[in-house]
């Protein structure tokens, strides 16, 4: 197996790629120079911290620390997912439950089936991938659900006046929101290997792993991303649609935080 270690000097030279982005922003007057510098600086600091934390966790190889790190990943994913919602507030709890349950079930299946072992260097990276994908899916679900509720207030009110429960009145909206949230993951699965070489597969090949073995891991990743996204969006949607109704089963659009 061929190995290649990137040096600090080569990493510093690679920073020139960021300079290119800054120059383009300056020339085209995009006013993104500060944002680019801030995002790059923040990414460097975050990755350095995470790198040393993971190095410690991997060396200790403690189950409780591994679980704590998985929960930390799910916490951050839920926090960012609820921030992506443009139409209602206080969605963190539902986001955390949805992402944690979705990721937990997927990880349990992978571990029990023998696809991965319950060791930090396997569980934590996998948890990061599935939680990140679930975060995006849940955010899309929230936005679509909020848009649909606002645009279809009249139809919802009519269904409620005819005796429908909030769940019945929201059934089509929930279904369409879940579907819209899953489309990016499904489309990604359709084009994997044809349009792009995904992260895990590329990383393994770059590290010198046999491409056929790398493909097997990528197939596993495709399965787990679809599973987690499906579970997380369904849970998040069914926990969230109730925010649009009061205790009398009336639609309360004033609770939305439309921007």
Description of each model-found segment:
Residues 31-53, 58-70:
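Loop-to-helix transition at the N-terminal end of transmembrane alpha-helices
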Residues 22-23, 51-53, 74-78, 104-112, ...:
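Alpha-helical transmembrane segments of multipass membrane proteins
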Residues 212-241:
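Hydrophobic alpha-helical transmembrane segments of polytopic membrane proteins
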Residues 187-212, 216:
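Non-cytoplasmic
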Residues 144-181:
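Short cytoplasmic-facing helical segments at TM-TM junctions of multi-pass membrane proteins
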Residues 4-17, 59-73:
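Structural signature of hydrophobic alpha-helical transmembrane segments
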Residues 6, 10-14, 65, 87-141:
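Loop-to-helix entry region at the N-terminal start of transmembrane alpha-helices
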Residues 22-34, 76-87:
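C-terminal ends of transmembrane helices
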